[in-house]
Each structure stands twice: as structure tokens, then as C-alpha cells.
Regions:
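Structural motif
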Residues: 18-26, 105
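Conserved polymerase palm-domain catalytic core
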Residues: 3, 46, 66-196
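Active-site flanking loop/helix segments enriched in acidic
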Residues: 8-17, 125-131
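Basic, flexible linker segments flanking DNA-binding modules
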Residues: 50-52
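A short glycine/small-residue-enriched secondary-structure motif
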Residues: 2-13, 40
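Duplex nucleic acid-engaging cores and interfaces of nucleic-acid transaction enzymes
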Residues: 56, 60, 64
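Charged boundary/loop elements
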Residues: 37, 41-46
Length: 196
């Protein structure tokens, strides 16, 4: 891969975008088209970032549905716990990401190309993905799919959705939602050496 060009946008906070050259973007698109159908079927239904037929509007509609259910059709209070994985793209661990991908992809040529894409950018040794690559969005979903599975299946939170590194859990009990912070923080720390 060739070096990235970079620029800043405000979305609403400043974000540093790294743009691959055209040749590398064609490769990223090809890798995305190979990996997406394999991993898409592993994601929870309520993951909304950069997925076909999902996105912000679908995520907001689903959140409103969760709030309606938690409030018994707006007859009682409902609460939402919004969490954000701290410095998510900057601190994605390359080794962990590549291990997660290798669980489903066994073709060595494909894995070599994926490794080259992942390792073409870093914010610290072995860490970070660039904002701006089509593959980065898919890699983010692959990386956080384990968190999604933990929240949905281990913590039994059915009214939960995620958009990239932000996720929201809805319920009718504020204290019950607040009590979820520590097990999620512990999961992130143990699995990814990360925090909320």
C-alpha cells in the first residue's frame, strides 16, 4: 500500500480522515466485497453502522421502537444508557483484528491482503485503523461483534443497538441499566484492553 493523504472534517467534532490512493481503494473495495457477505451474517440484527439496509435512520427507528416497548407504549418511564468505546479507531489492536478475521477466512492470499491493509496504517505500534477506508468500517463491525454478542447473549440485553463505537441499551429500570456498565467495561478490558 502507498501512503495515505489526510484531511480534517467536522462531524460535528473534528475527525482526522486518511484517504488511500485510488489503486489501494480498488483493492479495499474488492476485499470488502469478499469479506462482507461472510461476516454480515454473523452480526447481530441491531448493528447499524455501514451495513446494507441499515444506517442512522434505521438505527433511530429501532431505538424509538425499543423506547416504546420499554415504556409500555409511553405509559411508564423508560431509560437509555448510551456508551462510547474510548478512542476506538485509534486503539484497535491489529493482532486481535487479524485473529478475528482469520477465524472465518482461511484463504492465505486473502489474509495476506487483509494484513497489508490493516498494517498500512497505525496510530501506535500495532494499533489503529484509518477513518476513511471502506474496509475500516467493516473491520470495526468485526471487532465489536464480540461485544454485541456479549451484551445480547451473556447480559441478555435485547433492547440494545450499536452504531460503530457507540451503543445504546434501553430499559425500564435505571439502576439495572447503570449496573451494566461494569461488566461491559470488564469485558472490553479483558478482551480488547479497552474501556468505555
Amino acid at each position: 500500500p502507498l501512503p495515505y493523504s489526510s484531511f480534517y472534517i467536522s462531524d460535528p467534532k473534528p475527525r482526522h480522515i486518511h484517504k488511500a490512493n485510488i489503486r489501494d481503494r480498488v483493492l479495499h473495495q474488492a476485499i470488502f466485497r469478499v469479506l462482507y457477505p461472510i461476516f454480515d451474517k454473523t452480526f447481530i440484527h441491531d448493528s447499524y453502522s455501514s451495513l446494507v439496509d441499515k444506517g442512522t435512520h434505521a438505527g433511530v427507528a429501532r431505538l424509538l421502537d425499543f423506547l416504546r416497548k420499554a415504556s409500555a407504549n409511553y405509559q411508564k418511564p423508560a431509560f437509555a444508557l448510551k456508551c462510547d468505546v474510548s478512542r476506538f479507531f485509534d486503539l484497535i489492536d491489529h493482532r486481535i483484528l487479524l485473529e478475528l478475521i482469520a477465524r472465518r477466512i482461511h484463504d492465505e492470499h486473502c489474509l495476506t491482503l487483509v494484513r497489508q491493509i490493516v498494517e498500512s496504517f497505525s496510530t501506535a505500534p500495532g494499533k489503529g485503523l484509518p477513518l476513511g477506508n471502506v474496509t475500516s468500517q467493516l473491520f470495526a463491525n468485526i471487532y465489536l461483534n464480540e461485544l454485541d454478542q456479549f451484551v445480547k447473549h451473556s447480559l441478555k440485553r435485547h433492547w440494545c443497538l450499536r452504531y460503530c463505537d457507540d451503543f445504546v441499551m434501553v430499559g425500564s429500570d435505571r439502576e439495572e441499566l447503570h449496573a451494566l456498565i461494569e461488566p461491559i467495561r470488564q469485558f472490553l478490558d479483558e478482551r480488547f484492553v479497552r474501556t468505555l
